[in-house]
Amino acid sequence: MRSDTIKTGFEKAPHRSLLKATGTIKEKGDYRKPFIGICNSFNELIPGHAHLQELGRIAKEEVRKAGGVPFEFNTIGVCDGIAMGHIGMRYSLASRELIADSVETVAEAHRLDGLVCIPNCDKITPGMMMAALRINIPVIFVSGGPMKAGCTPSGKTVDLISVFEAVGQHSTGEISEQELESIEENACPGCGSCSGMFTANSMNCLSEALGFALPGNGTILAVDPRRNELVREASRQIITLVKNNVRPRDILSREALLNAFALDFAMGGSTNTILHTLAIANEAELDFDFSELNALSARTPYICKVSPATMAVHIEDVDRAGGISAILHELSKVEGLLDLSVPTVTGHTLGENIADAEVKDRSVIRSVEDPYSATGGLCVLYGNLAPQGSVIKTGAVSAPMMKHTGPAKVYDCQDDAIKGIMEGEVKSGDVVVIRYEGPKGGPGMPEMLSPTSVIMGRGLGDSVALITDGRFSGGSRGACIGHISPEAAEKGPIAALQNGDTITIDIPGRTISVDLTDEDIASRIAALPDFQPKIKKGYLARYSQMVTSASTGAILKTPVSCEPK
């Protein structure tokens, strides 16, 4: 066992003395058992994590019963909703790297034999996955579970996005202050990751397809008693994984990644999943290119439409309809789309995991013969505005905006854009451009939920597009194109845009372009001053210098001698 490094032999007496002082070692026989890290992310700032202390307790209890010695430790976490619309959002994506590094540090420093990872919200799940693949010891994921959707006294179903959009509605006088307060009070009824197919729930659903989590991980509600049972089962299973030395890189393959992307496209997951899955592939040293995604999306039917694409369906409804296993089982009917032979943490193949799954509600999960669209709910757009690509959640775009041409309304930061939209600067037909908000420029590639919500709230969702080198919340809807690469801070074409330039978006054609020649763009770029970092000290200053393009997952640069082969 790896942990023998810190517990076996007379020379390890000091180590054992310290371990005994923790109170976790109950008897000398514990030194012969595997040491299992309970990698929790409990904190009281994130509703998706406020209940995780109890899940950690359950995990420790089950690991000990199953023959291991549990050691709980915590990672940090950021609530994207609370961090939205101010300096805090610049820390959100950047926190993913801190989480990965911190999990690596604890597991390696203490020679743990395996990990039970308990994430939930946006950057915690991918951060833990990146660490798991980096250290490559047996790991199982069990999330905290989704939040239940809210309901106003009038019977209207609401969620967090309802609150953001209500701000825009209130600013135009469409709803009263009392109506806004009612939505605010009822949208988030308790613990769990926000209730739609936003980033957190998207990633926890993908965990099942990647093979890192047990069936039910993505959809069983945080308040459902089955969530606690799932934690118990996962905590027992880690002992089996350790005994059999089943490690993350034994599970994650190129085929498993393609399975996860197919699921993502079929349920219209968050655009952030592309960013995170590319980063996860990098940690596994798997060769996967951004440009491959459109071919897969073209073969994947969009069969499960969930908030924000529709307010009629939330994650609890997906669970009731059969969960992720049912979606995957339905997708398996498309010849060659899924590789069902890939291994998973259950000890069975993906195909075996989903063999008995069935769709219980066709209004939630459609058949592959009757999809919402024949192609997936996410895609990549290329063109002279995004030579390295950009992403859009097509499943949340209304029909009138699938093709759009309009004049650019350019803002060099999100705050100016929000102010301009609220003050009526943006008119029907415009294309709002928010730049210098990419991984380097932001820094941290902040989400644009506030401006997209204000656009929707002001009734412009069917007539205004928004493009950015930043990114979008999983809760954003409308013609929102993010991750434009190269970013403005790297003198990408988006930096050349001026007010009034004609931008054309063709989602079916997978293109985004500006009516300028290559020479026009080059001359404008040449006249620009070099980008000056907005933050000069602390973590974000270092992050800005080290982060790479969104098209590669916004991973950090490493020394050439340390780069994956």
Curated annotation (Swiss-Prot):
The keyword Lipid metabolism does not apply. It catalyses: (2R)-2,3-dihydroxy-3-methylbutanoate = 3-methyl-2-oxobutanoate + H2O; (2R,3R)-2,3-dihydroxy-3-methylpentanoate = (S)-3-methyl-2-oxopentanoate + H2O. This is Dihydroxy-acid dehydratase. GO terms for molecular function: 2 iron, 2 sulfur cluster binding; dihydroxy-acid dehydratase activity; magnesium ion binding. Homodimer. Its EC number is 4.2.1.9. GO terms for biological process: isoleucine biosynthetic process; L-valine biosynthetic process.
